[in-house]
Amino acid sequence: MTIVFRLAGALMAKGGAVQYRVDPKSGNRISALGLGCMRFPGAPGRPDVKTADAIISRAVEQGINYLDTAYLYPGNEVCVGASLERLGLRDRVLLATKLPHASCKCVEDFDRFFDEQLRRLRTDHIDYYLMHNITSPAQWERVVALGIEDWIARQKAAGRIRMIGFSYHGSAADFLTMLDAYEWDFCQIQYNYAGERYQAGTAGLLAAAERGLAVFVMEPLLGGRLAGKLPPRASVVLDGANDPHLRTPAAWGLSWVWNHPQVTMLLSGMTDTAQVDENAALADRALPDSMTATQLDAIARVLTEFEKSNRVPCTGCGYCMPCPRGINIPGCFAAYNASYAHSWFTGLSQYFTASAVRTSEAKLVSNCVKCGKCARHCPQHIDIPERLDDVRRRFQPGPVTAVLKAFCKTRS
C-alpha cells in the first residue's frame, strides 16, 4: 500500500502542506500530482516557452516534483529541458521521459535515442525512464532480443537511469504478462472512473501494487472529457451533490483516482497556472480511501450518463495526426460525441468548425481513403477509419456536405 504523508518547509503549497506518496521501490517521495508536459500550449512541435516556464515554476512552488515528457512529443523534451535550466529547478524535480522503442532496430539505437534525450533535457540522468506506449508483450520481446535488458543494466549502473518502467495501452491480460516480463520499478497506466475495465483497469492497478511497483496514472480525466465535457445529465448529478470540497467535474474525477491507495501519482496535463493551483489544492485534500459512500454513488450515476454518450473513446491525444488527407480526427470524434452528449446541432457546429472553419478547403471525413496510418498509432486501439464512417453518416447527409464545401469555396 502506498504511504502518504505531508512535508512542511520549502515545498509548502499555498494554503497548506503538500501530499506526497512513496515509491515503494526507491523510497522517493513523489507528489501525488505530477505535471504532464505533453499538453503545453503552443503551435504543433513548438510549445510556448513563456507559458511552459510559468507552469513549471508554479508547479514546483506548489510542491509538484514529477515532470513527464517523451521523445515522441514534438518539441517537448527540448522545451522542458530549457525551462528547467533557465529556472534552475532540475535538482528539485524527478524527470521522466520515454524511449521510442518501435524505432529501435539495434542495440546502438538505444544509446542514440537516450543520448539525444539527455542533450534535449540538458541533464546527465533520467529519474524515471519508460518504454513508451507498450500495447503487447511482443513489443517488449522484440527489444529484449536486441539486448535491452543488458543495456538497462549498464545505464542503471552508470547512474544515467534511476528507475525503469513502461507506459501501457494494451489489454488487461497482456498487462499481467508485462508485469512479470522484467524486474520493473514502476508502470504507468490509463485510469479513470470511466475506465475501470479498460486496458489495465482496476485489476491491473491492484496487480501492479501487489508486486510492489509504483503506479503512475495518465488520462485521469480522459483527455478532459471527464472535466468540462460531461453530458448535461451527468453535470446535473454533480451539481445536485453540492459537495463543498468537489466543486468541479475535474475535482470529482481526480479525487476518484487519488482515492485508490494503490495509486502513487497521477499526471495532469495542466495548460495554465490557474489549473496548477486548482489541482494542487485538490491534491492536498484527496487522501486514499477518503471518498464517502455518497460521493462514490454520485460518481456511479455520472458514469451511467457518460457511457450513454461516449460513442468513441478518443482522448484527443493527437497520436493519429497528421492525417494524410487533412482530416482533423480528434476534432471530428469530439464533435460526434458532443452530438450525443448534448444535441445533434451542437455536434454539427463542432464538426463544421473542425472540418471547414479552420481550413482553406473542406477536410471532410468522407475524404478518408482508409489507409490505416492513424489506427496504427492510436493508444486506445480505435478502428479510426470505421469510426470516421460513423461520423460521416451522422454529419454528412447531402445538404450538409454541400454547405461545408460551399463555405470553403467562398473563402478561397
Locate the predicted segments by residue:
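Short catalytic-loop micro-motif centered on adjacent basic/acidic residues
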Residues: 65-71, 162-166, 188-189, 265-267, ...
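Conserved, mostly hydrophobic/aromatic
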Residues: 23, 35, 67, 80, ...
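N-terminal binding-site loop/beta-alpha segment at the start of enzyme catalytic domains
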Residues: 2-93
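Structured C-terminal cap/extension of enzyme domains
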Residues: 64-65, 84, 183, 203-412
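Glycine/proline-rich, positively charged
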Residues: 43-44, 57, 61, 104-221, ...
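Conserved residues at the C-terminal ends of beta-strands
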Residues: 36, 70-73, 129-132, 167, ...
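Alpha-helix-loop-beta-strand connector modules within alpha/beta enzyme cores
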Residues: 78-97, 149-158, 210
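A short, structured active-site edge motif that brings together acidic residues
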Residues: 91-103, 129-132
